[in-house]
Amino acid sequence: KRGLAAMTSSFSAAICAAFGKYDVVHFHAEGPSVFLWIPKLFGKRCIVTIHGIDWARDKWKHGFGSRYIKFGEYIAAKYADEVIVLSEKVQKYFKKFYDRDTVLIPNGVMTHENRKANLITQKFGLHKDEYICALSRLTEEKGIHFLIEAYKELKTDKKLVIAGATSDTDGYVKMLKEMAGDDPNIIFTGFVSGQTLEEIYSNAYVYVLPSKLEGMPLSLLEAMSYGNCVIGSDIAEIADVVEDKAILFKKANVEDLKEKLQMVCDDVELVEKYKSEASGYICGRYNWEDVVNRTVEVYRGKKSCKEKLVENSSVASI
């Protein structure tokens, strides 16, 4: 089981960090934070980044996994020198349930050059602007089943590309493929990276993120950095990022998603409007250089890092 492997790896890493010549130990997510006390005993400065409320994810909702992850969340809130969060929603959550002040440092993204369709044409028969794209881990909270259901009711000749791999969710992936049936226009690419990933982002007509639950989705930032028109669910973790630069639908509402998809399929000019605004906006507001500088401040213990990250328009041109 990957969960057990992750647990033992986190324990081993915490031991190595405790005895290693490190000043700061940075834990990512609640699960590994269970072992934060080990390097803490050795006088290390311990930082935790909370990427989302992981114990609430569908695959952990019941049983030991959820309780274990929530215990790690408690350890992080109580004992970490600093807790970094990626969204205001999670920041409010830690204040409400643990009375813990946190540092808000969202994910960042770099500007990207768009690639012409080459590998994706050879591998999957895809061409520019001829497909709707979703890219994520194939887990239930990502809402891909909503997208397939909505897509099957569309009047369009555009294909649906679902890029991503299972995450201990083989049963869910099997269900998705059963929903798709023998429709040749629904394409599962599996895990993609490198040039193939870049080409998928670069040539999509629309990028869709139908999640029920998120931390701060890096794939959303990447999709917009490539100049994509985005349709996302109206959860705070997406809506707060995109503001008015993307199209939102009601979370888990297949009918509303279908209407938004049909709208963009029928209105090329609307899609081009969102595409023209996406990259400049997202790369200006969520710049990796800012993220790195603020994270280093947290490592050093500067209190100024607790100020909310604001848009720096001069960075957008870099």
Feature roles, as predicted:
Residues V109, L135, K159-K174, G190-F191:
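Glycosyltransferase donor-sugar binding loop
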Residues F191-V192, E199-A204:
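Short alpha-helical donor nucleotide-sugar binding micro-motif in glycosyltransferases
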